[in-house]
């Protein structure tokens, strides 16, 4: 058995040290790149408070320095190589997650416009298939509602077919559509935002099958983002008020449609309370565009998200800081990406809208489809739309709790993609960062309370519907109670729902 000479031992040690040094330099290079990329993305995301960003940056630079210095020694160098490798993996994974987060927030916050789709309709049994076929026909249009967009569409049509078209004005949606049904005219221009209004009228429930579209136009309108507050309305520095609007249709959340979900979320960062205030979709109130004439609250969404915001501000005497507009049909994908949510039901019932869905009193684990059925149901309850509003808040509450739990991490990227694809908001990245900063510094354990205004059933004409239609006449006492709760939130008082 040969013995190792001093020269051979020295050579072997030299080779080991050289190998360790080379591997150390390689790991340092990876760690350096991973650190720089992570720091850049962390700074870009802006949802992490600056104090925390600085602390993280200093810590990462310190670790990098220690790893660099210790490479001259064998044992400390081996230990820091392991640390470097693990840290590099964490930084790479963290960079991916941060970038996904940034992309999702940017997608939801960068949209500063609403869209309105106007279609050219003819009867489904007619011979007309394209604009050229109807250029000699008289086009039915609405006299005042959505007139700016309508006039722009008329100009586009005239340019396309190189002909000046004749138009006939109608006072409202009903008379316009009725003229098409009665063959008084053969072609009309109508915005899809008004289709929800037609759905509430028995005589026009078949509109989608009775008609066909021969041309379609999408109009964009910039949203006014100003910081003007009404001094007569409630407004506090430590209170943030969000309006959650849910449009229950397929299509992009930017589209103006009936707002079927109307929840005001008021957060007090001092008391740690969140008040969820639901207003039924059929609440009979003046809107900001109706000149004092009452309309269904849901119809405000047809005229834009700003109309819904202003209408609720008028009703409750508050300033709404931001809106979150959600495609409630797309809400299914959010819940499915969370692998379902546990929703509390006040009643046991079987859905009368969709067969095969039964809910027990108490907690029900729901996938996206079940949650949507649960949120839409009203015919199973004596209080109808009142209970539907409560159920919608229960679903929102369940989703918020799931998002705040560790379950979010199990399917993080899919959840964020679902959220960003189905919602838009006028909250800036800076405001989101401010709220995150408050949460991190105070570690608030939020107390979520719910209240829903109610009313009595009625059958009255609306601003958007001239013939009598189902509405909910507000209970003034309940509305005043809601105002009292809102004032307490703004006055830093704890709210207890009576």
Predicted regions and their residues:
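A short, flexible N-terminal coil/short beta segment enriched in small residues
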Residues: 82-90, 129-132, 266-267
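Hydrophobic alpha-helical transmembrane segments in integral membrane proteins
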Residues: 94-111
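Membrane-water interface of alpha-helical transmembrane segments
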Residues: 11-25, 51-54, 74-81
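Short, Lys/Arg-rich, polar N-terminal cytosolic tail immediately upstream
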Residues: 1-11
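Non-catalytic, solvent-exposed segments at the cell envelope interface
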Residues: 109, 113, 123-124, 130-132, ...
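Membrane-embedded alpha-helical segments of integral membrane proteins
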Residues: 20-69
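Internal/C-terminal transmembrane anchor helices
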Residues: 77-99
């Amino acid at each position: 058995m040969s013995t190792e000479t001093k020269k051979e031992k020295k050579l072997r040690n030299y080779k080991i040290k050289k190998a360790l040094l080379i591997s150390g330099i390689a790991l340092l290079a990876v760690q350096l790149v991973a650190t720089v990329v992570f720091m850049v993305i962390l700074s870009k995301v802006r949802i992490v408070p600056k104090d925390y960003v600085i602390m993280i940056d200093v810590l990462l630079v310190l670790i990098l320095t220690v790893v660099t210095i210790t490479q001259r020694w064998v044992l400390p160098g081996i230990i820091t190589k392991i640390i470097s490798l693990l840290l590099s993996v964490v930084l790479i994974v963290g960079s991916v997650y941060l970038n996904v987060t940034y992309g999702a927030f940017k997608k939801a916050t960068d949209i500063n416009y609403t869209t309105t789709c106007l279609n050219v309709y003819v009867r489904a049994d007619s011979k007309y298939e394209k604009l050229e076929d109807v250029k000699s026909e008289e086009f039915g249009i609405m006299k005042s509602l959505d007139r700016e967009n309508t006039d722009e569409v008329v100009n586009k049509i005239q340019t396309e077919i190189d002909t000046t078209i004749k138009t006939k004005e109608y006072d409202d949606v009903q008379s316009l559509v009725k003229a098409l049904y009665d063959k008084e005219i053969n072609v009309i221009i109508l915005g899809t935002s008004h289709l929800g209004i037609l759905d509430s009228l028995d005589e026009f429930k078949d509109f989608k099958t009775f008609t066909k579209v021969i041309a379609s136009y999408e109009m964009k309108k910039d949203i006014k983002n100003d910081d003007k507050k009404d001094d007569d309305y409630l407004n506090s520095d430590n209170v943030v008020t969000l309006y959650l609007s849910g449009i229950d249709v397929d299509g992009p959340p930017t589209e103006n449609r009936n707002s079927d979900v109307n929840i005001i979320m008021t957060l007090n960062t001092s008391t740690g309370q969140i008040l969820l205030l639901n207003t039924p979709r059929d609440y009979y109130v003046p809107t900001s565009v109706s000149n004092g004439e009452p309309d269904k609250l849901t119809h405000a969404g047809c005229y834009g998200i700003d109309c819904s915001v202003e209408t609720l501000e008028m009703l409750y005497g508050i300033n709404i800081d931001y809106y979150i507009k959600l495609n409630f049909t797309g809400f299914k994908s959010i819940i499915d990406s969370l692998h379902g949510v546990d929703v509390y039901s006040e009643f046991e019932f079987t859905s009368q809208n969709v067969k095969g869905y039964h809910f027990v009193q108490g907690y029900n684990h729901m996938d996206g489809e079940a949650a949507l059925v649960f949120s839409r149901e009203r015919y199973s309850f004596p209080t109808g739309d009142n209970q539907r509003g409560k159920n919608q808040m229960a679903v929102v509450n369940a989703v918020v709790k799931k998002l705040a739990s560790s379950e979010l991490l199990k399917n993080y990227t899919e959840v964020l993609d679902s959220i960003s694809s189905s919602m838009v908001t006028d909250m800036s990245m800076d405001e989101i960062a401010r709220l995150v900063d408050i949460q991190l510094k105070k570690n608030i354990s939020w107390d979520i309370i719910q209240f829903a205004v109610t009313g009595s059933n009625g059958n009255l004409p609306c601003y958007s519907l001239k013939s009598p239609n189902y509405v909910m006449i507000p209970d003034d006492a309940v509305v005043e109670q809601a105002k009292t709760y809102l004032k307490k939130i703004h006055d830093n008082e704890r709210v207890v729902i009576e």
